[in-house]
Each structure stands twice: as C-alpha cells, then as structure tokens.
Amino acid sequence: MSSKTVTPMMAQYLEIKQDHADALLFYRMGDFYEMFFDDAVEAAAALDIALTKRGKHDDADIPMCGVPVHAAEGYLLTLIRKGFRVAVCEQMEDPAEAKKRGSKSVVRREVVRLVTPGTLTEASLLEARRHNYLAAFAKVRDDSALAWVDISTGEFRVMACPAARLSVDLARLAPREVLLAEGNDLRSLVEEHEAAATELGRASFDSTAAVDRLCRLYGVADLEAFGSFERADLSAMGAIVGYLELTQKGKLPLLRKPVKERAQHGLQIDAATRRNLELTQSLSGGREGALLTVIDRTVTAQGARLLARRLASPSADLSIIRTRHEGVRYALEAPEILDTVRTALRQVPDMDRALSRLALDRGGPRDLAAIRNGLAQAATLAEALPDDALPPLWAQSKSRFFGHDALRDLLEKALIAEPPLLTRDGGFVASGYNVDLDEARQLRDEGRGVIAGMQAEYAEATGIASLKVKHNNVLGYFIETTATHADKMLSPPLSDRFIHRQTTANAVRFTTVELSEMETRILNAGGRALALEKSIFEELRQAVIVAAAELSDCARALAELDVVTALAVLARDEDWCAPKVDDSRAFEISGGRHPVVEAALRASGTPFIRNDCDLSEGAAPIWLLTGPNMAGKSTFLRQNALIAILAQMGSYVPATAARIGLVAQVFSRVGASDDLARGRSTFMVEMVETAAILNQAGDRALVILDEIGRGTATYDGLSIAWATLEHLHGVNRCRALFATHYHEMTGLAAQLSGVENATVAVKEHDGDVIFLHEVRRGAADRSYGVQVAKLAGLPPSVVARAREVLKTLESGERSGGNPAKALLEDLPLFANAAPPPPPAAPTSALEARLADISPDALSPREALDLVYELKSLADRD
C-alpha cells in the first residue's frame, strides 16, 4: 500500500502496519486506539462497534474504528478469543515534544507488545483458576520435544514428546497457543485441541541459537546447572523464548528455571479418556459437571491452578504420591492447624501473576500490594506452624516462608492499605514514607484549600453570591458567573482585577493574576507529587524483581498448602478414605462412589449406592459386566477409573477402603459420537479408540470399555467384542472393566482364568424393571431393553409389539429356526395402523399412591410414615 498520497500520520501508520501484517494494529491516538483500512473493517465486525472513516487514500475513504484506552482490555479479550493477534502501538512522547521538531512533526510511536492467546498477563484477560500455556513443538532428526510456559506465573517445562504422543500432551496441558515450525502437518491437530497454531520460520527452532537465548534469559554462561537437555528440548524452549522476545518487545517475563518432565513419572491419560471421564470439563464443554468442579475446595488462585494441574497430570511416582497423602492425613489429624491455615490462605492474593506483571512493567500499585499481602500471610503461617513433627510436604512449604521480612516491611511502610489499580492515579504511597512527597502533597492540598478561600473572597468583593471558581483541562482554574452578572465584572472597577477568558451560552469566565499564580503552584506541586510517587513505585518494583525467585518459591509453597488443605477438607466433608497405593497389581475398592454423580444425586435428595470392585491378580483382573441400560454400568466403570486418578494425584478417594497397585495408564472407551469433520461414523470412532487401547495398554494399565461393537451388526459386534476381551486378557494382561450386552460372552469367564462375570442387579415387578444399582458377582440373564424402552415413554403399542417380537426371536433361537423369517411372514394385517391404546384400568387412590412409590429411595422414617398413609387410604376405599 503506497504512502505517497497520505498524511504524515497515516504514512507512519502504514509503515508500522507493514511490519505487523498478520495482526490488528491498535494505533494510539490520544485517549483511543484507532484501527484503519482492513483492520478497521474486521475489528468493527468482531467487536460490534461503529465503522467510520478518516480521510482518503487513492481517492477512496479510509475505514476507521476505535476503542477507548481505558476500556481496551475488554476489547482485546474479545479479539483474542475470536482468533486475532493484536499489535499494541503506543505514543512514545508527548505531542508537545513532537511540535518542538516542527508543526508537521508526528508523535513518535512504537509497537510495545504483540498480544496473542499464549502471551496474556492482565488479570482481566485471564481466568484466575486456570493456567494460560504457550507451547512449542520441535523436531530434531528423530527426536521431538514439547515445551510449555505460562508467562503469567513463570512456569517453564519441557519433555520428550514423539509426534504420536502430541495429542495426549495437548489434551493434558490444554495450551492456548502452540508454536510450530513452518511446513509442518500438525496445524489441524493443534486446532482440534482448541489452541491457536502459530507457525514460525525454522530458524526460530535452531537449537544452537536456543542455547544463546536461554543463557541470555537466565544470565548464565551455560545451562549445565539446569540439568541435561536434548537438542529437541533446547529447540522447543528456544522457540518459546524467541517468541517472547518478539511479542514482548524486549521485556521478558520472569521465568523459573526450566524443568524437564519425564513421561514415565506421570499417569498417562489420552485425549479420549480425558473427555469421557470429564476430568476438567464436561462433555458439553463447560465446568459444571466436571470432576475438577466437584473436588475443588481451594481458596487461592494459585492453589486452584495447582489442583487443576495435579488432576490433569497425576503422578506415577510412589514417593510423590505417598508424600501428598501424608500431607492430607496431617491436615485431617490437626484440625486446629487446618482451620488456621485456611483462614490465612483466604487472604492470599495471586502473587504469581502480580509478580509477572511487575516484571513485564505492566503492573500497578495493587500488584505490589498483592506481594505485600501474600508475604504477610506467609509470615502468619510461618509462626503458626510448629517447628517439629511436620511431614515433609508441610515442612518444605514452611521453609519457603522465611527470609522476606525486609521486603514485607518495606512494602507495608510504603503502600496504603488499598492502593489504586494504576500508577498514574497516584495516591498509593503512604503518608510518612517520603518527606519530599509529603511536602509536595501538603502544598498541593493546601493550594486547593486556598482556591476555596479565594472563591469566597471573590464572591464578597463582587457581591455575586453565585460566583464559582472551577477547573477544566483546557482553561485550568477560572472564575465563572452567569451572563446576568457578567456586565458588572466587565465594567470598572472590577474589570481592572477580573480578566475575561471565555463566554459560553450560559456563563462568562474570568481569571485573576493571583488565581493564575496559585494554579501554577498547585500544578507544580501536584505534578511533583505524582512524579515522586512514580519514582517510588519503580524503586519498589525493582526491589520485588530482585527477590523474584524467592517470592516465586513462597507463592508455590502457599499454593501447595492450599491444595493439601483443600483435599483434606474434601475428604472430611465427603467421607473419603486414604488409599493405599503400592507397586503391586492390586485394585481393591470397597464401597466406591462416583463423586460427580453422588453430588448430583445429593442435590435431589437421592442416596448413591456404593459398590465394591476387585481386579487384583488373586481375584480376576478383568470383570465382564452385564446388565440393562440405566442400571449404572457406565457409572461403575467411570467411578473406578476416577478413583485411580484421584489416588495418584495425591487425593483421598470416594470409598470406604482402597488399595491400588500403581497404575501407569488409564484408558476409557465409553460413549461415542460421529466425527463428521473427519468423515468418521460413530462405529469408526469407537474402533479407532479401541485400537489405540489394544495397541498401547501395558500390563499396568487400567482399561474401561463400554459396549464395544454395538455400532454394527450383531454378530460383527459380538465378534469384535469377544476378540477384544481375549486380547486384553492374553496380550495386554492389564486390569480392565468390560461392560457388554452380548450375554454370549459370559461363557468366557469359565475359559479365561483372569475373567470374572459381574452384573448390575435389577428387580422385576408386574412387567416393570426396578434398578437396584448394585454390582454383584455373576452374569445377567437378559438386558431388559423393552422394559427400559417403556420407562423412556415409547408408545404402548410399540412396547407391546416389541414384546411380541422379542418372544418370537427368543423362541426361534431355542428351536433352531429362522425367527426373522417367521416375523416377516407373520406381520400384522394392518401393520401401518397404530392399534388403539388399551382402555385405562380404573385405579383407586390406594393403587395410584402405590404406583408413585420408589421403595429404594425411602428412608426408614419415610417408609414408616408411608405405611400409615397407605393404611388410611385402604380404610377409605
């Protein structure tokens, strides 16, 4: 786009825009960020704001739209969520400075930041209880790695990640943005995980340049002290640091030293299993109904993020798991300490994100106050926790609360209790902290008092009681009176003292020599006070940055205590037990419950039926579960997988007792739907997920499979389910729960030593089925599908016909004939005519009341009351 025919300002805009062609340019003009040309058209549509015009270019109007600077963050969030990148261009000098270079000089402007989904730091742009990860995937020869960072908290990690595993780790981390080398074929995979895919030149992934970037970031000569990293690790980490240099324009965040994770140290959960188990979000995509929402009792933002990370990445390291369980047990056994810690934690702000904003020079007085308040509560906890008898997790956390007294005292002396959000507002430094500031404030405030006195004196001198001394940004201080009284002040002798400044429609404005002099004194004092406060803020900010590493450790310790005490409160309130996790192959659950379903049932006043599960080697590591739909098979499958995950994240579990041999992988194939975008039917999705399980599950895996083979013809489905179970038993040799409606498979329990039949119990009454939700040893005799269909509300004629068809099919199978042919030959004469519904049988009040009763839902007291009620109805009839 040519800049020859545009104004100097527009020429500057075009030059800056040329360097940021892939982003919307927020171009600062006074109190607004303006956008022009195509940026304006796109932004106006995305933000639903007015599209106007400003000047012409090549004889065409230039489209323009803008947003106020003070409200820009809200608009930024909308644009980022809609997939845009935004380059923020600020005025780097005052317009008065530009005018000194000539009347046509343009204010100097620079892009100070490139805002992308993975580089957000402002509180208003982030979810407080969720990480905001920026990830990078790098491949060097045969090795590949995934690195990720949250610049709002400083977390920085990397791990080896074969391309085949990338989907698993993207599902675990849920990054907002992923950096890829140009020319890759992974964009669609990244976008499937609802992350923005950003392609960079291959030079950005150069591992040699990465070492230089990392050494420069941490101020070290080499990276040996950080551990051993492969070239692919360095490539991924270097791409992230280079991208941060690009987007933050030289103001790099405070990143912790990179930590190398190892896949074998974590419980592996693939994307389909995470989705099916609804760990962090429900199948509908929201938080309601997810396991995380049900178990979250944290009271700090950093604690909530740590809990979410633990649930997404449970441990497979016995020592870590046991240390966490020991920490929860200590909290439960010391209720007074538990209450003290929780009380203190409720007053802890988000120190991590405050620290990050201060490091990037985007912070304000409230971020300093967040550091101060967090350190104050850390000191409270350091004093409250005993010096001995603390388990390792608690002792390590306490050790990080010391050594901050000097910084805490400095911030407590320097800041008022509730400082404003922005530095430019001033008024955040406490009185008595700085003598020069106190003097400037006194002069400023006294000057304002003098102004009030001058107004009274002017009113008396002129005899105009309504006279006012006012202020605006254009005239400064001025005297205002109505037009009615203006003639008096414009005439001698008052005109000798009162100098006319401005006439408006309703008033006339004046000034005096002494008012102008006082205005200068006030402005100078106010400006000096604000300048001093800004200088003090910078001194305090630097003091915080110097202590950043120790402050980050302190914040992590507070988060650790928040998580361990939150899990203790959860266990206490929900009656959860301490699981025993060891290196055996045991899986013994007594009285297990599904935490999310139990919470939902409690809300409706319905009790949850507890069930046992034993997949230990001494019993049978595979249970073949049969029973009708709606009986609770899927709930039983899921609850046992959730119990394993909760145990290995360090939580107590919803059971009366639990012993779990370490689980290395959890796989789930429950429920399916079409994948239209990739041309996959429900059955194809089911087969792909089943194939992944059979190909990947090791002997320490826990597998739950629900109704394999249901999406195809009966014998095809039975064959696939049969072969799948045999493979799990003979090849994978893992612990598994296998639910099916193929009752023919129950005979496998007699042939395969590691398979045992189990069923969900039901009762029949007058042709109806009653679900007991109890899992028992043995096989179901049938699936009760027709009864469930009746409960679902199918028309009576359809239910009646279904019973006839079922009877014919079952009798035909027993006789060895062709039941389907018999059905076709015996179609009703008027098959298309719906038979009239049977006449409703007259019912008495007693019969109607009996029909409404759900016996399993009655408490003993309710049952006794019901007996008296039924006796009364019987006597009446």
Curated annotation (Swiss-Prot):
* Keywords on record: ATP-binding, DNA damage, DNA repair, DNA-binding, Nucleotide-binding
List the molecular function annotations (GO) for this entry: ATP binding; ATP-dependent DNA damage sensor activity; damaged DNA binding; mismatched DNA binding
The record's InterPro entries line, in alphabetical order, gives: DNA_mismatch_repair_MutS (IPR005748), DNA_mismatch_repair_MutS-lik_N (IPR007695), DNA_mismatch_repair_MutS/MSH (IPR017261), DNA_mismatch_repair_MutS_C (IPR000432), DNA_mismatch_repair_MutS_clamp (IPR007861), DNA_mismatch_repair_MutS_core (IPR007696), DNA_mismatch_repair_MutS_N (IPR016151), DNA_mismatch_repair_MutS_sf (IPR036187)
Q: Which GO terms describe its cellular component?
A: cytosol
Q: Which PROSITE patterns match?
A: DNA_MISMATCH_REPAIR_2 (PS00486)
Question: Where is ATP bound in this sequence?
Answer: 627-634
Which GO biological process entries does UniProt record here?
mismatch repair
Known function:
This protein is involved in the repair of mismatches in DNA. It is possible that it carries out the mismatch recognition step. This protein has a weak ATPase activity.
Spell out the family assignment given in the record's similarity comment: Belongs to the DNA mismatch repair MutS family.
- Its protein name is DNA mismatch repair protein MutS
Which species?
Dinoroseobacter shibae (strain DSM 16493 / NCIMB 14021 / DFL 12)
